[in-house]
Amino acid sequence: MPRLEESEIKKYWQIFQSLKPQNNKLTGDQLSSILKNSQLPQQQLSAIWELSDIDNDGKLDFEEFCIIMRLIFDVINGKLPNVPQELPSWLIPASKSAIIQANKAVNQGNNNFGDIDDDEDDKLSNDFDWYISPTDKSIYEKIYDSKCDSFGRIKYSSLNELYNGLTNVPSSEISSAWNLINPKSFETIDKDQTLVFLHILNQRENGKRIPRGVPASLRATFSKEVPNYDLSAQAKPSISATTETGKKSFAENYLNKIGGGVGASSTINNGRNEKGTDFSATQGTDWEEVRLRRELQDLERLLDKVQNDTKNQKDNSNNNQDNNDMLIKYEFEQLLKYKQNQLNSTTNASKNSTDLSSVKQDIEEIQNQVNTLQEFLTTKNQELLKLNQQIESLK
């Protein structure tokens, strides 16, 4: 099956954000509606959740959310007849490949990438020294400078060539060291974490057993506080003469390779660490940072455009300002004239209404007089008729 496409990851990001994650993680309750809408059996959904929740914290970050969405879609569409027993390598986030390798080593009781025999483990000493000498620090910084990205971050896979040159450090121990300095399982680590990570590998290469925890001052370093490389208060302050004389030079071959071309990229991969899907799709520490940087660039371009448009409009407005003022004055004068005409019309209408009432009264009086004259005429006509009748009778 193909890797996750960038467009697919962006689609999952929109869904992820719409569910309003808390601390960049989603709970089972927040995902319940999506899981139910898939109409997959509960047994399959549980198996998919177990595969997706790589760090076993009961919540899914964005990378784990991408995994569960892709697995659900592939099962629904028939691309996967059944839920796989383990994640395919192309679906494993690069930031969590070390966790999966460590979990395999614990669950299976062995490590496919190189086990530690009991006899070899017995040879390891417990006098692990957290102190980073100036010489070692200089070596670690050279390695860091050769592999850090533009944000000053280091990926686990970017040091594959260094891992290949370690003869006494199995892959499981490299993963353990990475998890020790990267407790939040980020895809990348900063400079302070890188220096401590390389120091742990250096100590392990020289026969020191990797401890299970880190001093409090280093935990503060991993929390982005000011680092303190002199940890004599928490660990043994000095290194014995026998240790110094018998100490193996760390990453000597690797330093010789990068000495002539610090910026060269490594193409060597011994197969111990398959490169998983890069969910960031761009350089950066996380999607939120990349998104904000893009938005900032868009806003800067928009601001430049607005400033240029405003400048052009200002130049044009200086030429047209006088004409605009005259036009506005003319429009207001016409409005005033219109309002005055309306007022005059209203006054005249009121006067005309008074004159009309007087005329109506005159008409009514004339009508009454006409009626009276008509009655008088009728009476006289009747009298004339009687006189005419009398004259006729006398004849």
From Swiss-Prot:
Ca(2+) binds at residues 53, 55, 57, 59, 64. Residues 40-75 form the EF-hand domain. Residues 8-98, 136-225 form the EH domain. Induction: Regulated by GCN4 and induced in response to amino acid starvation. It is a peripheral membrane protein. It is found in: Cell membrane; Endosome membrane; Cytoplasm, Cytoskeleton, Actin patch. Residues 285-395 form a coiled coil. One of its GO terms (molecular function) is actin binding. It comes from the Eukaryota. One of its GO terms (biological process) is ascospore wall assembly. SUPFAM superfamilies: EF-hand. Residues 305-314 have a biased composition (Basic and acidic residues). Residues 305-325 are annotated as: Disordered. Keywords: Actin-binding, Calcium, Cell membrane, Coiled coil, Cytoplasm, Cytoskeleton, Endocytosis, Endosome, Membrane, Metal-binding, Repeat. GO terms for cellular component: actin cortical patch; actin cytoskeleton-regulatory complex; cytoplasm; endosome membrane; plasma membrane. Residues 315-325 have a biased composition (Low complexity). PROSITE patterns: EF_HAND_1, EF_HAND_2, EH. Component of the PAN1 actin cytoskeleton-regulatory complex required for the internalization of endosomes during actin-coupled endocytosis. The complex links the site of endocytosis to the cell membrane-associated actin cytoskeleton. Mediates uptake of external molecules and vacuolar degradation of plasma membrane proteins. Plays a role in the proper organization of the cell membrane-associated actin cytoskeleton and promotes its destabilization. Belongs to the END3 family. Component of the PAN1 actin cytoskeleton-regulatory complex. This is Actin cytoskeleton-regulatory complex protein END3. The gene is END3.
